[in-house]
């Protein structure tokens, strides 16, 4: 079905242009992800390659951190900045609240504020991570470890992060899907061949013949687990709670009844991306401190281990962030107050529920229940593979396998729905003033 949709999409000029534009942007991103930042000895970086923090950072950067490339920061600073701006709109800063109510003009101001915060965070994060890696490695990761080198690397990585952020915005406007998610999607896909190779090397090379059957059992179990996660995730991400609504007789041209679709997981996969990005922030701060106080400070090491997602405390912290962001982003995606207001303006209502404040409270309660289901689902899918790796000593690629699959599936679902939307537009192009070109 997907390939049929894709084939039909390529027949439409506008859709074809959007697909090719997205592919071009992703090609440029992957090209930049292989250009190592000047002044960095990437071979020595392998000493810290197994750090859980680096794995998480590599995930949210779109697989650009492992080479310490110009795009090593990826969209992580932008994601953190977006969270900050959305929080500031919740009656914290009056100016941001005012902008949030100004429509398109306000949205542009908020986007500009997000860019400025991204710039500051990217600079702080790039210098902090570089200094931290230098402190943790017995070899020089920075070829000339002085403040000029740190500043130069910081400026280069910050510039790269801003370029990647711009790429994401271009995908939003001229391509397919959410730019941030698509960039992370491309990074995950690019890492699949190396992940397969690492499993093959670990399970089938240099092992005793008697261990081969267990290796096959592991691989089959891994494939079956992935299939189950894909099926369950696809089902949950597309499941809806249909709230019946009715129209007053005074509303001309409207049906007598309809329904309001609310997704079982209203927040989608964004909370997982947010949580992954936020978990890198404490590590950045701790690496600043580690650089200034020395690498053998006991309390710093203890705190770093506690916040690492591979430890039980770190797992709980990661799961808690996913739950909190699921509730937060569900109410960002579905605003009960605006929904109640729009229903009232349309002359529609939910049976047995009073219009206005009554509808707002009803939708809020329903959204809380749906967000509870969504948060538990996202948390379990993300945490179970990490716990399995801890308990059974599985290969490290398993740990973030659930998180990676969640992102891959959600981005694929969004892309298919967007394609179907454009094809539906083409189907009814004859009724429009400017039909889509198909040549």
UniProtKB/Swiss-Prot annotation:
It is found in: Cell membrane. Its main location: membrane. PROSITE patterns: SECY_1 (PS00755), SECY_2 (PS00756). The keyword Lipid biosynthesis does not apply. Disulfide bonds: none annotated. The chain crosses the membrane at residues 19-39, 68-88, 116-136, 151-171, 176-196, 216-236, 269-289, 312-332, 373-393, 396-416. GO terms for biological process: intracellular protein transmembrane transport; protein targeting; protein transport by the Sec complex. It is a multi-pass membrane protein. The keyword GTP-binding does not apply. SUPFAM superfamilies: Preprotein translocase SecY subunit. Keywords: Cell membrane, Membrane, Protein transport, Translocation, Transmembrane, Transmembrane helix, Transport. One of its GO terms (cellular component) is plasma membrane. InterPro entries: SecY (IPR026593), SecY/SEC61-alpha (IPR002208), SecY_CS (IPR030659), SecY_dom_sf (IPR023201). Gene3D superfamilies: SecY subunit domain. Coiled coil: none annotated. PANTHER family: SECY/SEC61-ALPHA FAMILY MEMBER. Component of the Sec protein translocase complex. Heterotrimer consisting of SecY, SecE and SecG subunits. The heterotrimers can form oligomers, although 1 heterotrimer is thought to be able to translocate proteins. Interacts with the ribosome. Interacts with SecDF, and other proteins may be involved. Interacts with SecA. Belongs to the SecY/SEC61-alpha family. The central subunit of the protein translocation channel SecYEG. Consists of two halves formed by TMs 1-5 and 6-10. These two domains form a lateral gate at the front which open onto the bilayer between TMs 2 and 7, and are clamped together by SecE at the back. The channel is closed by both a pore ring composed of hydrophobic SecY resides and a short helix (helix 2A) on the extracellular side of the membrane which forms a plug. The plug probably moves laterally to allow the channel to open. The ring and the pore may move independently. This is Protein translocase subunit SecY. It comes from Lactococcus lactis subsp. cremoris. The gene is secY.
């Amino acid at each position: 079905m997907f390939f049929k949709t894709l084939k039909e999409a390529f027949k439409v000029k506008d859709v074809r242009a959007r697909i090719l534009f997205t592919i071009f942007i992703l090609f440029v991103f992957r090209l930049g992800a292989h250009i190592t930042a000047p002044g960095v000895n990437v071979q020595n970086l392998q000493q810290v390659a197994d750090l859980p923090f680096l794995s998480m950072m590599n995930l949210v950067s779109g697989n650009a951190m492992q080479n310490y490339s110009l795009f090593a920061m990826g969209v992580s600073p932008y994601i953190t900045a977006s969270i900050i701006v959305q929080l500031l709109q919740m009656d914290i800063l009056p100016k941001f609240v005012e902008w949030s109510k100004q429509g398109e003009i306000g949205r542009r101001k908020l986007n500009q504020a997000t860019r400025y915060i991204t710039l500051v965070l990217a600079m702080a994060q790039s210098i902090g991570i570089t200094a931290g890696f230098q402190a943790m490695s017995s070899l020089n990761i920075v070829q000339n470890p002085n403040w000029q080198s740190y500043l130069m690397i910081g400026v280069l990585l910050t510039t790269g992060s801003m370029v990647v952020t711009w790429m994401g915005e271009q995908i939003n406007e001229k391509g397919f899907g959410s730019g941030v998610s698509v960039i992370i999607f491309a990074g995950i896909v690019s890492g699949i061949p190396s992940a397969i190779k690492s499993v093959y090397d670990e399970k089938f090379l240099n092992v005793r013949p008697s261990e081969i059957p267990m290796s096959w059992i592991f691989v089959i179990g891994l494939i079956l687990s992935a299939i189950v996660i894909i099926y369950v995730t696809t089902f949950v991400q597309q499941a809806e709670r249909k709230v019946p609504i009715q129209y007053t007789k005074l509303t001309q041209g409207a049906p007598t009844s309809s329904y309001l679709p609310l997704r079982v997981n209203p927040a989608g996969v964004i909370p997982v991306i947010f949580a992954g990005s936020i978990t890198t922030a404490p590590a950045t701060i701790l690496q600043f401190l580690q650089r200034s106080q020395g690498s053998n400070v006991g309390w710093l090491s203890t705190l770093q281990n506690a916040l690492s997602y591979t430890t039980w405390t770190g797992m709980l912290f990661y799961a808690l962030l996913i739950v909190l962001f699921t509730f937060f982003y569900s109410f960002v995606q579905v605003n009960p107050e605006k929904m109640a207001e729009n229903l009232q303006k349309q002359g529609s209502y939910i049976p047995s529920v009073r219009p206005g404040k009554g509808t707002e409270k009803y939708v809020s309660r329903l959204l809380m229940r749906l967000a509870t289901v969504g948060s538990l689902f996202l948390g379990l899918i993300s945490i179970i593979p990490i716990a399995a790796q801890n308990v059974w000593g599985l290969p490290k690629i398993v740990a973030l396998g659930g998180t990676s699959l969640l992102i891959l599936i959600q981005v694929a679902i969004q892309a298919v729905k967007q394609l179907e939307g454009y094809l539906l537009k083409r189907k009814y192009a004859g009724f429009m003033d400017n039909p889509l070109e198909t040549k």
